[in-house]
């Protein structure tokens, strides 16, 4: 049996597509999300589905320990769980900022903390953090969200440097516009309408599986090759 893959936020969109790709390659999976029924509905073989909020580190550690007891050490963690709540700083509900930083930044740190000690001890392992083009440049209405994704880029690169001597890899995947549920949680209808119009102007956006294929490409390199970052976007996406 191939090595264990842990994926957060796997109940839809990019996380679901990544889960399907790794399952097709024969990997056992630990899938975590708040909507566990969506995970179970994927009906993937050799898969443990756990209801976990990534902001709850203890629950995440418990789920990983349970999966490792069944499938062996986690060889890869895909930190995919994320929230995108767009808005102008002067009008946006401050609770939305906190929710994004809790999930996108602290949740990511919780995931890395949960697996890194074991990876360093084994001198092997890969962490793949799903960030965004919004972690490389700014966009209107994205101030707080960009802040979280710039943090993901900084954390990923810093930790990559720290664990490189232990033969552990850290990769950042930075997608542009992707067809997922992320935008649906934004409360401003004007912002959502503008985003939808932008997607039409581009002639369409990335599919979740486009991002999943980038993840697989990075992971399937030999362990002595670390793809530090992949940025991908629709060809017609200018910013």
Q: What is each stretch, according to the model?
A:
Residues 11-12:
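Conserved glycine-rich cofactor-binding loop
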Residues 52-62, 94:
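The beta1-alpha1 cofactor-binding region of Rossmann-like NAD(H)/NADP(H)-dependent oxidoreductases
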Residues 88-89, 96-98:
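Substrate-binding pocket helix/loop in short-chain dehydrogenase/reductase
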Residues 112, 148:
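Active-site helix of classical SDR
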Residues 132:
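Residue(s) in the substrate-gating loop at a strand-loop-helix junction
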């Amino acid at each position: 049996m191939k090595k264990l893959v842990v994926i957060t936020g796997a109940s839809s969109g990019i996380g679901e597509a990544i889960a399907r790709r790794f399952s097709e390659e024969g990997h056992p999976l630990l899938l975590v999300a708040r909507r566990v029924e969506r995970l179970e509905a994927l009906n993937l073989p050799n898969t443990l589905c756990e209801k976990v909020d990534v902001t709850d580190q203890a629950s995440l550690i418990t789920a990983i320990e349970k999966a490792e007891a069944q499938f062996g050490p986690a060889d890869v963690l895909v930190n995919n769980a994320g929230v995108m709540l767009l808005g102008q700083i002067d009008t946006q509900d401050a609770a939305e900022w906190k929710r994004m930083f809790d999930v996108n930044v602290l949740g990511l740190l919780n995931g890395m903390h949960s697996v890194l000690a074991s990876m360093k001890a084994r001198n092997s392992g890969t962490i793949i953090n799903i960030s965004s083009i919004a972690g490389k440049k700014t966009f209107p209405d994205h101030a707080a969200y960009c802040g979280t994704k710039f943090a993901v880029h900084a954390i990923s690169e810093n930790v990559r440097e720290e664990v490189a001597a232990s033969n552990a890899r850290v990769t950042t995947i930075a997608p542009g516009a992707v067809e997922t549920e992320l935008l649906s949680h934004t409360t401003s209808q004007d912002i959502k309408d503008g985003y939808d119009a932008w997607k039409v102007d581009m002639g369409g956006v990335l599919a979740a599986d486009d991002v999943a294929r980038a993840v697989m490409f990075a992971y399937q390199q030999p362990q002595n090759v670390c793809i530090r970052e992949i940025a991908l976007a629709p060809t017609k996406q200018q910013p």
